[in-house]
């Protein structure tokens, strides 16, 4: 899940995959805007055939939290 998420992240910000870690924060470390983040969530919904809860997604700060959330949604 982490590797797939890392690849998708690089579509939204100019960061090399190898610089993205589980502890990377979307806004502070990777330079995401709110629009970037919401756009990425839409792509994740399409890619993994899931439905992201916007209130839950608003609490996600790091790549690791996003990966855990995606794993939870894809296992339901």
Which residues make up each language-model segment?
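Phosphopantetheine-dependent thiolation modules in NRPS/PKS and related acyl-activating systems
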Residues: 1-32, 41-42, 47-76
């Amino acid at each position: 899940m982490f590797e797939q998420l890392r690849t998708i992240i690089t579509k939204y910000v100019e960061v090399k995959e190898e610089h993205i870690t589980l502890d990377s924060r979307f806004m502070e470390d990777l330079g995401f805007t709110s629009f970037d983040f919401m756009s990425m969530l839409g792509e994740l919904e399409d890619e993994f055939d899931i439905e992201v809860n916007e209130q839950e997604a608003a609490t996600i700060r790091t790549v690791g939290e996003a990966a855990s959330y995606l794993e939870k949604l894809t296992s339901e």
